[in-house]
């Protein structure tokens, strides 16, 4: 067995296409369009590299990652050849090879679909720690009772500064900017504000896809000074009612990031339920000692 760095995009794509991906992290980050996946693989080849396990001149597994911030990476893989058993020891060697030349403050992130993928032994062997869970939650019916919520209003430009600060503080990576949200507002894009005592205490951004007959609560948050006061739940209830009352849709859904499953279950009271969830892990080089690569 040998660890070999790969540079041929066609070879990498071909292996991934025919591989077993039951333990592949961030599988949903692989673009469906060929030109987009070429860009991702090209970036990965440049840094930190695409690495493979080879036996008898045949590729048995591949792992790669891409940067989303300085020294922060999302790991895609491992992709494993059919009829090949990837041991935890071999995975550890493969992963250490990819990370060995990175600075001490480098962070490698993993994401696996709970209940579908196998990941625990791999995360344990490299000493990756649990980070959080992304829950994808949906509702398919409106609330049975109408809820009067006088504190919730459509967006008003007088609250732009407060909204902008709250949004950028809450969503730091790969999110629409406050101005992008403003520019998008129309019959199918709505921004609702929770205002009390003249202060913005929360907001929710709703996006309607009429072709797919679905609505996404793309962003929602409450101000840190007013957490645990039910503001988020009032916004969600309002959006749920608004979407089903005004559009012909099948479901309303949103994603929420949390470590507390009990908190997530509170959404059941609004008719939401967990559709699927992604478990997130992170590997921090500085927290793991003796990262020498086995000969």
Predicted regions and their residues:
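A structural microfeature
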Residues: 61, 132, 200-202, 276
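Active-site rim helix/loop that mediates acceptor-substrate recognition in acyltransferases
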Residues: 26-50, 172-197
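Short amphipathic alpha-helix that is part of the acyltransferase structural core
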Residues: 1-34, 145-175, 293-295
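Conserved acetyl-CoA-binding loop-helix of GNAT-fold acetyltransferases
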Residues: 84-100, 222, 228-241, 265, ...
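Conserved donor-binding loop and adjoining core beta-sheet/short helix segment
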Residues: 34-93, 204-224
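Acyl-donor-binding surface of acyltransferase catalytic domains
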Residues: 83-148, 278-286
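Conserved hydrophobic beta-strand within the GNAT/NAT acetyltransferase core sheet
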Residues: 108-112, 217, 252-256
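Glycine/small-residue-rich hydrophobic helix-like segments
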Residues: 182-247
């Amino acid at each position: 067995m040998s660890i070999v760095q790969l540079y041929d995009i066609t070879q990498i794509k071909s292996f991934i296409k025919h591989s077993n991906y039951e333990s592949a992290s961030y599988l949903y980050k692989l673009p469906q369009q060929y030109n987009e996946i070429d860009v991702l693989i090209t970036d990965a080849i440049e840094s930190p590299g695409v690495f493979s396990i080879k036996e008898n001149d045949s590729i048995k597994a591949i792992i790669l990652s891409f940067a989303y911030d300085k020294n922060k990476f999302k790991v895609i893989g491992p992709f494993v050849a059919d009829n090949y058993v990837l041991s935890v020891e071999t995975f550890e060697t493969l992963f250490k090879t990819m990370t060995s030349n990175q600075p001490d403050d480098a962070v490698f992130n993993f994401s696996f679909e709970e209940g579908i993928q196998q990941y625990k032994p791999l995360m344990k062997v490299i000493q990756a720690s649990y980070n959080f869970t992304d829950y994808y939650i949906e509702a398919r019916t409106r609330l049975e009772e109408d809820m009067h919520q006088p504190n919730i209003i459509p967006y008003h430009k007088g609250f732009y500064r407060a909204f902008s600060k709250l949004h950028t503080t809450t969503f730091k990576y790969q999110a629409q900017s406050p101005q992008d949200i403003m520019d998008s507002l129309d019959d199918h894009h709505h921004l609702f504000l929770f205002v009390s005592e003249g202060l913005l205490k929360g907001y929710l951004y709703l996006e309607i896809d009429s072709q797919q007959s679905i609505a996404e609560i793309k962003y929602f948050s409450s101000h840190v000074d007013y957490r645990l006061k039910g503001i988020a739940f009032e916004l969600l209830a309002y959006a749920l009612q608004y979407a089903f009352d005004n559009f012909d849709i099948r479901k309303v859904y949103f994603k929420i990031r949390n470590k507390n499953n009990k908190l997530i279950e509170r959404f059941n009271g609004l008719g939401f339920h967990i559709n699927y969830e992604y478990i997130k892990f992170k590997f921090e080089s500085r927290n793991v000692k003796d990262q020498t690569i086995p000969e």
